[in-house]
Amino acid sequence: MTDFWLNYLDNPTLSVLPHDFLKPANNKSVEGTYTFNIDNGSTDFKFGLAVFAALVYRLTGDEDIVIATDESANTPEFIVRLNLTPELTFQELVSKITKEYENNISQINYKALSEVSHRIKEAKGLDENPGLFRLSYQHAHSNQQLNTTVEGSIRDLAIYTDGTKFTIYYNALLYSHERVVICGEQFAQLTTVSGDTDTVIAEVFLITDFHKKNLPDPTIDLDWSGYRGAIQEIFMDNANKHPDRTCVVETVSFLESNSKTRNFSYHKLIKLLIVVGNYLKETGIKKGDIVMIYAYRGVDLMIAVMGVLKAGATFSVIDPAYPPARQNIYLSVAKPKGLIGLEKAGTLDQLVVDYISNELDVVSTIPQLKVQDDGTLVGGKLEGADNDCLNDYQKFKDQPAGVIVGPDSRPTLSFTSGSEGIPKGVLGRHYSLAYYFPWMAKRFRLSEKDKFTILSGIAHDPIQRDMFTPLFLGAQLLVPTADDIGTPGKLADWMAKYGATVTHLTLAMGQLLSAQATTAIPSLHAFFVGDILTKRDCLRLQSLAENVFIVNMLWSLSQTQRSVSYFEIKSRKADPTYLKNLKAVMPAGTGMHNVQLLVVNRNDRSQTCGVGEVGEIYVRAAGLAEGYRGLPDLNAAKFITNWYVNPDKWIEQDEANKKSSETSERTWSVKPRDRMYRSGDLGRYFSDGNVECCGRADDQVKIRGFRIELGEIDTHLSQHPLVRENVTLVRRDKNEEPTLISYIVPKDSPELKTFFADVDFPLKKSNDPIVKGLVAYRELIKDIKGYLKKKLASYAIPTIIVPLVKLPLNPNGKVDKPKLPFPDTAQLAAVAKLSVSSHDAQAAEEENLTKLEEQIRDLWLDVLPNRPATISKDDSFFDLGSHSILGTRIFTYEQKLNVEIPLVSFKGDQRRPRFPIGLSRYNYSRREQRCRRFLKAKTYTMRRSKELSKELSKSALLESYSSLKQLPSGSVNVFVTGATGFLGSFIVRDLLTARNKNLDIKVYAHVRASSKEAGLQRLRQTGITYGIWDENWAEKIEIVLGDLSKEKFGLDNSQWSDLTNSIDVLFTMVLCHWVYPYSQLRMLNVIGTINVFNMAGEVKLKFFSFVSSTSALDTDYFVNLSDELLAQGKNGISEADDLQGSAKGLGNGYGQSKWAAEYIIRRAGERGLKGCITRPGYVAGFSKTGASNTDDFLLRMLKGSAELGLYPDITNNVNMVPVDHVARVVTATALNPPSSEELTVAHVTGHPRILFNNFLGCLKAYGYEINPADYPVWTSALEKFVIEESKESALFPLLHFVLDNLPQDTKAPELDDSNAAKSLKQDSKYTGEDFSAGKGVDLDQTGVYISYLIKIGFLPKPTGTGEKKLPEVEISDESLKLISGGAGARGSAAK
């Protein structure tokens, strides 16, 4: 093979189309299909391929598109790889496709595409075959399917076409049927441009008429003039109505014995904040001035904020934990006229004090605001003053400042990251602070009875929601201590103790809430979070609070204020299975009341995107923030006038609706503005209008709840004197945690040498640039991190900084980010080892760590994501690459020494906590232990069964077997085991009725019974149960008693001799049981089989027939082999296959016992045994009356689906054959073996095979109220039906099986049945009937089964009228009596 494919397929992008469900583990797939037609004539294949490529580009945003295709139905697959750009026209795309397609056909020098995969694996030294594609577009053919035989590749979606008809095969575990239907509609919509090939591919409108109603209309009114009033006035109104109601509760610290709970009523707080408001107003603060608050979580913050608002000013908050240099940056942006320091926030750093004195014009200051235990408010003494600054203003506590504000007055200044290293200040509006609360109260069941928490970051704008929501509702606000927040497990205790009902948390705080928590919080019913929310986070929270509804309010930004999206996750109590089929990351949802999320085409802003198409998210609402402070150009770029509608429309409407009572407020408002905020986030619509976020259009990211501007990090990095080039990315580490990593190129200078360590690298690592850079420049990395600490918040400092000789560039001259490697575990381990200099090692030895300190050091090494070279006493847990969420893992060890360690102990100086922390080895959970034991037992059982089979084939077989060459004419004696089973009874029927004109057959039936009379009665009863018994058979049946598991069945020599000298043909069937392990089935199914065929070694020559099962083929090997054979134009698995493909991997004892028996029979065949092994699949009911074994998987599926009203839309072929035809094949192959020279195998396969969903869907055709559902949806509905609603279901005994991976478990290989057809043809000379064409189960046959099942009471009658009428079937009263008594529900002899 040439190197063309090796180069062509180097590092391909395997596009994943937008999907609906969590990506399945182990690449599981469930095949679903959808067919549509293109009405505008036949579509040229290459044009269709171009349309598909364009659709993939639009739905994924990937520019590197990789699709598998073919030249015709019978030619090898090959890959077409395209680089698409948004300006491409369809004419250019078709030309590009045609060139690639025709060139790549000429490069096909292989028989199968797997050869290319093998070649790449060998050339690159990979452990496994690489994936070459996930999507394909191919010519229609007879074996089209989702599964691919290309090793290493997993196909998610495939389109097969003949030019007019298009069939999509898709993984139903990834995509809902509705999603695929939409893809088909969008494909058809894209083909309409064929008449205008100059259309740009990125500008074709993808919204179909059917889904337009579910997507937001960007032209409707969003209540631009719906101002509800200022939050401070609403708060005052609540205080007047309910003065004695508790407003704020500051709770006691569990670590401070002298602390106490403090309660503040609405009336008390109003008095205090009026004092603050009047002080600010009287000391020079004017409407719209900014007042900066140095904050601390407590009632003091609430008083300061509301006091600023009462003065008509704008409040902004600084967290004292920020570095002083960064505090100064915030001050430089805000330019405040007033300052309020909370006493508990501590004193200002001198650097900040100097900046305020020298750079700001501050007219009003409250230096140390505090509410004392007696309820009095103090503000601290100003410089040079003798009295408290608020003393003279206490008299105003009953006289509000009287400042009137309007909807466009600016109450808040919040900060967000800045790409130039300077945070941006965002001015909020009063319109937003209260507008959405009435809707939220109704939608999320909030009221004045709720108890809210204040847990958001004190300098982050979500804390506004924490405070203002309860104040609007007249509810209560609970304030925790830092110890409650910082100690894992205690936050849950605190919530439960104080009865918190509603909480707003960042994702990071939510993780702290669930970390090590054991206390349930039944009172909590609403949990609001604004972040990328994962299923794991939801499950953790709901394990603590089963009544909690989690509401993700994404885009709760400073820029959008309260105008946000929401997605509600139902509580575990309301719907235990709700989360099961959601993806790992929760959707962003849809806009709340009068808020729209518009996903806009990035290449044509006049269009909103279609379902699934990647676009940029704009938030349209009346409640957007005013804009960025002092940044008019940025405001113009981010706060954009809606271009979908004329803005004058709303101005005219507002003027017409103006009321005279609004005059004072309108003084402080502007005209209605229909604006959109350009979020910079990429997203796509679901079909129901919900939005999922799928990345950023810029370089802003969110880690652990903090929004970080990568450009800001890079700006500061570039200003370090020893950094020449740099770029910062977010990559996932080995634990799938998002990690900040910066790549730098050091600036060559004399100073650089002082930061360079000359290391003697081992030969193995001498060529690894990552290891060399991290080791040689470790001192430079420390210096850079120290430098960044002074410029950035701690969460924005890169965890890893990788020095490189140069940054890789792509052909466009930009940094080639995909080629920037994340150091793997082996590299980091090498760095840790090589970084320990002799000085470091000596210093570590001289530290003389105590046993406790050694334990703590080892614990840190266990927890830290990237192992450091050394840890000294002066190192910080956080400086070594950790963060507060990761810190909670340390507390998994605290129970060993019975200590509680508040996370706050890591902060402050951020040194090692001074607490004894024990270590423990990782122990597998009980579930993991059970899984390991099961897998071990399964592997052992299969290996043991194989070993025992080999041993028995040597020790238990006769030296030789002399067999018949052909069936004797006239009288034939047949020995049958399993005659009282479902299939066995029909074999007896066939033997005694089908050939009675040409053969005189007598049946020797082995029956387990106390006497021959009792045995005959058992046989008779079985025949009557299934409606097939003829009393005339009794004289043709001889009952044989004995134990098949014993040699000679336990008979004496005389009885054994009489039996063996009488028999011409031996039939053996075995116990069918899906639960018993191999060890329980071995004696009967394996040893019993040996004892039966050893009869063939006695004096009289015999044929031998063994009824096996396709269960012996139930491994992935045969499913894949079947696909390969069908692709080669063959019929399926050969009857000559030796079954080595299932020598391992069979999942149940029944299949293992069949495999073992077949293995031993083959060895006997090598010693002369003649006859046939016959393998049926599912044995269905009697074709004439529908008589069935009701304890059957397929019939349970039929009944269970009817009960549920849903059936799984699984498109696997089902190899089910009516029992009378299976019996005919078994008797034909026994009496007329396919070969007289050797032991052979015959497959029983359906002609035709019915699809699984068509079989279950037959119910609808006959009048049942039932609909198809994607498998994940069906499993959730079934689980809810059985478990939550406690309803009886026919599927209850099989619940573990049907809920696991039914589509994969019911996938069966296609089978070649040439030998079966040959025997049936030969048998026609006896029967007069030629059944060599085979039989199967179709819609009409299923109707017979349904009628039978209704008549015996297994199925209810249909409630509706279907397209087909159920046929009449006859069942005798005697049969019905036996069935009602429990007969007819035994296992059959085959699958």
Curated annotation (Swiss-Prot):
Keywords, in A-Z order: Amino-acid biosynthesis, Lysine biosynthesis, NADP, Oxidoreductase, Phosphopantetheine, Phosphoprotein
Membrane-spanning segments: none
Entry-linked CDD domains: A_NRPS_alphaAR, SDR_e1
Pathway: Amino-acid biosynthesis; L-lysine biosynthesis via AAA pathway; L-lysine from L-alpha-aminoadipate (fungal route): step 1/3
Cofactor: pantetheine 4'-phosphate
Reactions catalysed: (S)-2-amino-6-oxohexanoate + NADP(+) + H2O = L-2-aminoadipate + NADPH + 2 H(+); (S)-2-amino-6-oxohexanoate + NAD(+) + H2O = L-2-aminoadipate + NADH + 2 H(+); (S)-2-amino-6-oxohexanoate + AMP + diphosphate + NADP(+) = L-2-aminoadipate + ATP + NADPH + H(+)
Molecular functions per Gene Ontology: L-aminoadipate-semialdehyde dehydrogenase activity
GO biological process: lysine biosynthetic process via aminoadipic acid
EC number annotated for this UniProt entry: 1.2.1.31, 1.2.1.95
Coiled coil: none
Entry keyword Transferase: no
Record note on cofactor: Binds 1 phosphopantetheine covalently.
Domain spans labelled Carrier: 847-927
UniProt cross-references to InterPro entries, sorted A to Z: AA_adenyl_dom (IPR010071), ACP-like_sf (IPR036736), AMP-bd_C_sf (IPR045851), AMP-binding_CS (IPR020845), AMP-dep_synth/lig_dom (IPR000873), ANL_N_sf (IPR042099), Far_NAD-bd (IPR013120), Lys2 (IPR014397)
Domain of life per record: Eukaryota
O-(pantetheine 4'-phosphoryl)serine sites (modified residues): S884
A Pfam family recorded for this sequence: PP-binding
Leading EC class: oxidoreductase
Signal recorded as keyword: no
Function: Catalyzes the activation of alpha-aminoadipate by ATP-dependent adenylation and the reduction of activated alpha-aminoadipate by NADPH. The activated alpha-aminoadipate is bound to the phosphopantheinyl group of the enzyme itself before it is reduced to (S)-2-amino-6-oxohexanoate.
Membership in a protein family: Belongs to the ATP-dependent AMP-binding enzyme family.
Subunit structure: Heterodimer of an alpha and a beta subunit.
Protein name from the UniProt record: L-2-aminoadipate reductase large subunit
Protein species of origin: Candida albicans (Yeast)
